[in-house]
């Protein structure tokens, strides 16, 4: 799993993002471009009610605007 807009952008660019979660109450300047990238990449997208909910779901003590499950790299 990756948490945060920068890490999510990297996961989308590399094709590793499998399912993206965005917080509805996060700044649209952050979430809208990420949602557009998800649509362009054909990546599943789920909107979560709040940053606090998404942060808790990710196991962190602060809110998160964005997160994703990612494919593991195989060596």
Feature names for model-found ranges:
Residues 36-75:
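Short basic, glycine-rich beta-strand/loop surfaces that mediate nucleic-acid
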Residues 1-17:
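Ribosome large-subunit tunnel/peptidyl-transferase-proximal elements
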Residues 10, 32, 56:
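Alpha-helical elements of the RecA-like P-loop NTPase motor core of helicases
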